From Swiss-Prot:
Chief subcellular location: endoplasmic reticulum
Gene: EMC9
Top-level taxon in the UniProt lineage: Eukaryota
Protein keywords: Endoplasmic reticulum, Membrane
Subunit structure: Component of the ER membrane protein complex (EMC). EMC8 and EMC9 are mutually exclusive subunits of the EMC complex.
Lineage: Eukaryota, Metazoa, Chordata, Craniata, Vertebrata
Stored PANTHER family: ER MEMBRANE PROTEIN COMPLEX, ER MEMBRANE PROTEIN COMPLEX SUBUNIT 9
Cellular localisation: Endoplasmic reticulum membrane
GO CC terms of this entry: cytoplasm; EMC complex; endoplasmic reticulum membrane
Topology of the protein relative to the lipid bilayer: Peripheral membrane protein
Name by which UniProt lists this protein: ER membrane protein complex subunit 9
Functional description taken from the UniProt entry: Part of the endoplasmic reticulum membrane protein complex (EMC) that enables the energy-independent insertion into endoplasmic reticulum membranes of newly synthesized membrane proteins. Preferentially accommodates proteins with transmembrane domains that are weakly hydrophobic or contain destabilizing features such as charged and aromatic residues. Involved in the cotranslational insertion of multi-pass membrane proteins in which stop-transfer membrane-anchor sequences become ER membrane spanning helices.
Organism: Homo sapiens
Amino acid sequence: MGEVEISALAYVKMCLHAARYPHAAVNGLFLAPAPRSGECLCLTDCVPLFHSHLALSVMLEVALNQVDVWGAQAGLVVAGYYHANAAVNDQSPGPLALKIAGRIAEFFPDAVLIMLDNQKLVPQPRVPPVIVLENQGLRWVPKDKNLVMWRDWEESRQMVGALLEDRAHQHLVDFDCHLDDIRQDWTNQRLNTQITQWVGPTNGNGNA
């Protein structure tokens, strides 16, 4: 297992998803360009899935299929899974998180499982509030922190704080919202634009 890089876009949307539903478990998928052997796995985007129907397999299948098709159109693969437990002091992956991450790893062996650390999930955390796990055989184990890269951690951290202050998380749409009202955009293009506009002036371009 090589390096993994987490983009601002992927990190920010994951945090906003957890912030929108602070008393619920939430989960989602990471997308990445398929890396060649030995290349860094770059998680460029994430798709928030559920906040109330996490264990319903039919809805999960629908979501996985739609995200897979949508990602493929942009040359991306489902390369990881994130999960935040409802309990503030629980950062351990439960049976559901392990099952979904395992399913993704069947198709993409280098997939990562990221658990959000709710105790560190504050507007501007000093260190990334995540635990990155990799698949080793039948077990998910913490990935070497030296192999976890951030496109720009300082910028990502500040961006989450600013967007929370602007209440941007209230505009985030997960698959639950979309299934309740199919007019709602689970790809979050409006929010993506808001994030990339923030990144652009800092980096000189619109890439997250």
